Amino acid sequence: MLDQSTHIRHLAVVPLSLLVLVLASAQVRSEPTRRLITQAIDESKRVELPGNTHPEANTENDRGMVPDSFPMEHMQLQLRLPMEKEDELDNLLQKIQDPSSPNYHKWLTPEEFKQQFSLASEDIETITNWLKSEGFTVNVINARSVDFWGTAGQVRSAFRTAIHYFDVRGVRHIANLSNPQIPAALAPAVAGIVSMNDFKPHPIGGVR
């Protein structure tokens, strides 16, 4: 099973500015990213992406499925890097914040960051081709995610999870009822999915 909290830890704890403009001097060299997807996609072999449901998207609040035509915009497939690249990024982030480091506050441009800390291009192509084959439109490919959109029917077919209406404290929401699934061949390169629901995070001490 995939551990989403581990593999997207940088997205959760590192300021966006540091992920977009990460430390590097002109002399830093990075090895090409190792491919993670090594098997052909077999739709009969699936794995679940745990931790990808909202706690209030439960049977008590369930009000039934949305129409298949319901638009699902700006979903994001979160990508994972090989462990050696994660370690390299950890090291760079430590140096950028260390005043004693000769690389203190030396930055990569967004394009350089994408080149150094993205999946192998072959893996990204495999993932985006699979999304397109399921009828989705790919909007943006970032270093750590693929932004895409489609319909609730396409989500149910591709990810084996249905999008339902949920009434929570007088407000209607939409969300996936169960954890999504992906072909097992893609699992080494995928950490999770964001934005399959419209629940907004509450501030600390706010309503939960």
Model-derived regions: residue spans:
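Non-catalytic regulatory appendages
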Residues: 27-208
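Bacterial N-terminal signal peptides
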Residues: 13-23
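Bacterial N-terminal signal peptides that target proteins for export
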Residues: 2-15
